Amino acid sequence: MAVEKFETALKKLEDVVKKLEGGELSLEESLKAFEEGVKFSAFCSKKLNEAERRVETLVKQRDGSFVTKPFEEEE
């Protein structure tokens, strides 16, 4: 799979889902589409995880200055 951009992979994943939901594919075509969809889903998940690690939170200090801190997901 030579997809480089998240948006491209997401669009292709959406297209695969539409094909599968359409119900007009043969069993073999459905399996192939499903396998493609799993690959696109894994790629998108990986890209989202990479982006999450890069996100930083801007925090205002008492003196009015700002610093960045790593993003921490609230539980």
From Swiss-Prot:
A Gene Ontology term for the protein's cellular component: cytosol
Catalytic activity: Exonucleolytic cleavage in either 5'- to 3'- or 3'- to 5'-direction to yield nucleoside 5'-phosphates
Subcellular compartments: Cytoplasm
Listed EC numbers: 3.1.11.6
Pfam family, one: Exonuc_VII_S
A molecular function (GO) term: exodeoxyribonuclease VII activity
SUPFAM superfamilies referenced in this protein's UniProt entry, alphabetically: XseB-like
Keywords, in A-Z order: Cytoplasm, Exonuclease, Hydrolase, Nuclease
Top-tier EC class: hydrolase
Superkingdom of the organism of origin: Bacteria
GO-annotated biological processes: DNA catabolic process
Family named by the database record: Belongs to the XseB family.
Role description: Bidirectionally degrades single-stranded DNA into large acid-insoluble oligonucleotides, which are then degraded further into small acid-soluble oligonucleotides.
Oligomer status and interactors: Heterooligomer composed of large and small subunits.
Record HAMAP family: Exonuc_7_S
Name this protein carries in UniProt: Exodeoxyribonuclease 7 small subunit
Organism, scientific name: Citrifermentans bemidjiense (strain ATCC BAA-1014 / DSM 16622 / JCM 12645 / Bem) (Geobacter bemidjiensis)
